[in-house]
Amino acid sequence: MSVNTAATLYFGYVLTEEQVKSLPDEDFAYLMEELEFLHNTDCYREDYSSFIFGVRLGRTNDGIISINPHVDYPTYVKIIWYYEKYFNIKNEAPKHLLAHCWS
């Protein structure tokens, strides 16, 4: 995948499971660096899901970003799994997260 992975995540690019699996090592490492940065910012709250704001999430009018489980949950879980594997973190992925950091 010849893209700046983290940047495309910011713009709402949807990564499929196969695309995540096939990321070159360099792209995957860069993505993990970006996730770690978000993990350590003020936008990081009680969970680590804020990094995924651009990936298969929908923004509601009340400032909440929510998962669309009918379409998006498998990819969400897959990318969470990659995050857990890389950082050796185990946590329950929340269904909602505050979006003010991204507005």
Task: Give, region by region, the residue ranges found by the protein language model.
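Acidic (Asp/Glu-rich) sequence patches and key acidic residues
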Residues: 1-81, 85-93, 102-103
